[in-house]
């Protein structure tokens, strides 16, 4: 299934090259891709003045004509957006599961391919969400509200939320608020570019804590989780095994 804002041809532009030579990209390519590799974050300025921070293992795709006739882009992974206001040209984030439309706002959009849910947290402004899995009316979010979409059922749930932690990853922080160990492992793998395997008996175990990616090593994080969650870990065959 192709999203409505995907073009046919893609130009992969490294982050540094994008900043230094965005005006010299050949016109026979229709799309620009900016990607944050595992273990890194990326910040970019879009042509309309909007700012985007990409979390580890994420990427955005947008047209070279972004901001002229439309402001559509696609997101894979997680990004925090500060959208420049433009009443005439709405800003749209397109994914297979849900599309988001705004005029100007600040929000966090999390939708990794191996996640079971899509999560959108609104900091400022107002956003309209269109379900891409099942037909329903647009859902609107106000500040300090969060939408969670189940990728299997298409169910969208809106709730009040403390969104101040939604984008702390921009500051190299990890915050786990009673999250499932399996979900924590996914974040750690992306943040530290490592492989982690969780024993089936631990998949429903939860953990609360916070860490600094640039100060705490992966071993320190796993040691803290192990000491409070009644579990062990070992490094074997190029991966960490939690048991």
Give the ranges of each region predicted by the language model.
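A residue-level detector for the "anchor" residue at the start of short, highly conserved motifs
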Residues: 3, 7-243
């Amino acid at each position: 299934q192709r999203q409505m804002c995907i073009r046919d041809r893609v130009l992969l532009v490294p982050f540094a090259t994008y900043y230094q030579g965005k005006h010299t990209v050949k016109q026979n390519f229709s799309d620009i891709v900016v990607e944050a590799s595992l273990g890194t974050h990326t910040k970019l300025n879009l042509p309309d003045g909007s700012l985007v921070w990409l979390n580890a293992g994420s990427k955005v795709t947008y047209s070279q004509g972004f901001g002229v006739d439309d402001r559509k882009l696609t997101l894979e992974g997680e990004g925090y957006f500060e959208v420049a206001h433009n009443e005439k040209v709405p800003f749209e984030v397109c994914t297979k599961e849900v599309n988001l439309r705004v005029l100007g706002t600040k929000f966090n959009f999390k939708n990794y391919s191996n996640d079971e849910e899509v999560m959108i947290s609104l900091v400022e402004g107002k956003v309209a969400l269109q379900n891409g899995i099942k037909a329903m009316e647009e859902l609107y979010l106000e500040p300090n509200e969060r939408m969670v979409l189940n990728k299997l059922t298409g169910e969208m749930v809106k709730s009040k939320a403390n969104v101040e932690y939604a984008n702390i990853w921009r500051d190299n922080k990890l915050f786990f608020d009673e999250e499932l160990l399996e979900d924590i492992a996914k974040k750690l793998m992306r943040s530290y570019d490592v492989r982690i395997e969780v024993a089936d008996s631990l998949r429903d175990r939860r953990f609360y804590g916070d860490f600094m990616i640039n100060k705490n090593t992966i071993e320190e994080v796993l040691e803290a989780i192990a000491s409070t969650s009644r579990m062990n870990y070992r490094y074997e065959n190029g991966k960490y095994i939690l048991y």
